Amino acid sequence: MNTNLLFIPLKQSSVLDLGDELRQVITNNYFQPASSFNSDLIYITQLRNQVAQIKNVNDELGKTSQDDSILLEYLQVLNTLQNKFSDDCVEFAWFDTLAYGPQGPYRYRSLKIEKLNVIYQIGSLYSQIAISESRHTDIGLKRACHYFQLSAGCFMFINNFLIETIKNKNDPLVLSIPLSMQSSTIQCLEYLMLAQAQETIWQKAINNNSMKDSVVARLSIQTSEYYSKALDFGNSSDLIKLEWINHMKVKKLHFLAAAHLRSSTIAADSFQYGEQVAHLRVASQAVDQALKSKKYVNSLVLEDLQGLADVIKVRLRTAEKDNDLVYLKIVPQEKELKTIIGVSMVKSIIPEAFEQKPESNTEIFKELLPYVIIHVAQAMRERQDEYVQTKFHTPISSLNNMLVKFLIDRDLPSSIDSIQQPENIPDSVIHHSQEILKTGGVDFIDKAFKELDKLKLECNHLLQECETRIDLDRSEDDMLRRKQGSTRWTRKSTDDAAQELIKKVDKMKQYLLQANNGDGFVLKKFYDIKPALDVYSSGYKALSQYIPNSQYIELPEQLSIVISDLRSCLARANTLESERKEFLQTLEIRSRDNSILPKLITEYNSNRSKYQTENGEFNFNAFESVYEKHMKLFDSDIKYIARTRDSQMTLEHEIDSINQKFVQEFKSLQNSSNEKRQQVLQYLETAYEKFLEIINNLTEGSKFYTDFIEKGSAVLQECEEYLYRRRVESRDLELAISNSFQQQQQVQEQNEQLSVPRNYSNDKLISPKTSKPGLWNPNSDIQFS
């Protein structure tokens, strides 16, 4: 395209079988057959491939219009997909083209990023449509201006989305923003399109011979300001190439010079000849600066600039000569000139299609269950599992531990085993040995401690990474604060800006310290009972050798009855534990088999308006009634917990009463061998109790560290996003400081150049009255010379 304006090249994307990708997602995650959506899947594959095949257009407006409709149609499809699928369901690949040649492919597993890329394509396409319009007619200029504004609106839409994303601290998309979507790049493109839209208005104005110079000057200065903003953002972007930077710089200075050229004409018409010279000097200086940046700039742009420069130079020489010889007006400096106030005739227009909902009769995947329903079902399933754990597993485990401790505190069953089985291994010890071997014994605990150490190492690494991010921001902020000075570097320090994050990291450190102390206590407990566990794990023979025999004691009839009653109570305790184990197994099966998803689907299909607003947003709270109704499934089981607790309390009371009788009856019959055997048996019972505690401690420790990793990873992501936002903030602040300094420097240089280098004598000169050239002043004498 042979033009003095810029168009934005389209990104490139490889062909993707999007339909097949979505088919796999439906098959793996939805309770609906993918074959039901074959036509939709084929359609979306064809549409995505059409998008990938769109090329940069030339002057074929019909082809451009068709490409426009394809992109807008695909955008509507993406809006539907966002309601039906998770954001990370498919991976897309794009090539950036803003810099020197295609770069990539850059891969993104995000429907949001795909949507932004499509909007970027639409903005690029609108810029090309605008340039393809004729600039020799008012209609062509009007259409070009409209498309440039639409293009600017596309990039404004992208930038607004990025701003909201960065504000949202919990959005993981912050770290996935493509380089071509960074704020400086997008804003450069937006203001470039606005500048070119304003330029078409300016061109239409100069084509009108009756247009006032003041209006043209204001249009020119506003065009220059738009190019100036585009240039500022372009300088801070990594993708805007030198050709574009120089183009925008030349355009900025060109329209600055054009504005002052028009202002000089206005000054001359008002007999302000000093101001006329000053405006022309500013214009001359502007074109001189522009010519210094002409490298790589389009020849048409340079021709326009050179033509303007020639006019300015001629008028400046004439105006200076007339003022020096005739008018003798003092030439003011640039800062003393009346400011030219720009008038903007353009704005960023977001295409209406971006906000439109797809028509119900053309919407694809209409019968596909929205992914949020799956998400809600998963969340409620997790709540259900947590409910079962909290209301059933934890209470029953606590009751069992209380029962074991209750018996061990009363030396049961070791006290009666030492009497009734003076030589044989008690059944309870054999049972404990089998349970320990089934669990894995010492090897299992050793392995569990090693796994715990790995988790702990990962947790410490997470903590270190969080601290590193904060320390990195602190060092960067301190360095820039020293470089720029605290007067100009006005943003918050790291300790203030990251106050909440620092609190979270400190809390993480405290949790890990407490957990480490707890691990040490559990490890000591393990070493205390390790000898007993080795005996338990060594088999029947080792137990026989470890447990000493005792002498046979003939028991009185009354004591035998008491022991028999105790045995009966202990058997009931074992039965109680077995019943609880069977109850939990049955409960797990029932919980697994009763999924809440079918109920959610039924409720959603029966009354969609209740669960989904007109804007397509879901009312998650409305599903709560479905969950509450579903959880009534466990009402009867709650009653079982109360019953088994009451049964245990009754049994413990009965055992305690009988055991007191046993202790009183047995005191007179106990001998040293019997006492020694009872102590060993009691040690083994205590070791088994501590073994169960250690297993429970290790399980809790593993859960703690796993949860810590999950939550710590979220904190680390917050630190990453915080560091990213702070770096963007630093770059913007540095740019603002740099621009302010450059503006001050330019003003100073201009003032030095515009100062009048003439020395007048101390004689007072009477300034002649001003008059337009060619008019005779009747007060002057007639002279012939």
Curated annotation (Swiss-Prot):
Segments for region (Disordered): 748-785
BP GO terms, sorted: cellular response to lithium ion; cellular response to neutral pH; cellular response to pH; filamentous growth; filamentous growth of a population of unicellular organisms; filamentous growth of a population of unicellular organisms in response to pH; positive regulation of filamentous growth of a population of unicellular organisms; symbiont entry into host
UniProt cross-references to InterPro entries, sorted A to Z: ALIX_V_dom, BRO1_dom, BRO1_sf
Biased composition (Polar residues): 754-770
Domain BRO1: 4-403
Cellular compartments per GO CC: endosome
UniProt subunit comment: Interacts with RIM101 by binding to its two YPX[LI] motifs.
Family that this chain belongs to: Belongs to the palA/RIM20 family.
Function: Required for the proteolytic cleavage of the transcription factor RIM101 in response to alkaline ambient pH. May act as a scaffold protein that recruits the calpain-like protease RIM13 via SNF7 to its substrate RIM101. Required for filamentation.
Name of the protein in question: pH-response regulator protein palA/RIM20
